[in-house]
Amino acid sequence: ISMIVNNKEVKNFDVRLAIHKVDYFVPVDLSVFSGKTVSFKFKMNSNDPIRVNLSPDNTACCKEMKLSDTFDTTNREKFRPTYHFSPLYGWMNDPNGMVYKDGEYHLFYQYNPYGSKWGNMNWGHAISKDLVNWEHRPVAIAPDALGTIFSGSAVVDHNNTAGFGAGAIIAIYTQNSDRQVQSIAYSTD
């Protein structure tokens, strides 16, 4: 799916579209585009023989797609853990860059916010004061022109050794597209 805002593609992500029955919904936050024209362009996988003759117009997912100001994230899934951390929706993998700063533990993890399987790799983010109760935060690092976000690590730079500011959280990670590159991101807030 390509997200197009005012005739410009701003995001691209892979989604498993429900053909006959919708098993789950995936939210896409449009609030940052308030007042702008947003459209979605679907490209079906032509190599999949099941989908060759289908279009978004005759699929269950598009018939049930809707705008909403809220998204129910109540954990109703039979196999989703209740004691160990898991995201509100989507798929997660290995934790990356766990740090402690100002009385809070920060957990970063590989995350697909658009499906229940591997893909669309972002770094999810959650914080906790006790490592049991977690507050979900917005995606920390999202794919860009260099690719999706793979494994890495993070540190708190208490002494400003990197020059980004004392106490900055610095993440170093692999990005993947047609080749892999090493990237760095930092936050001072």
What are the residue ranges of the model-derived segments?
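Beta-rich carbohydrate-recognition and catalytic domains
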Residues: 1-20, 26-189
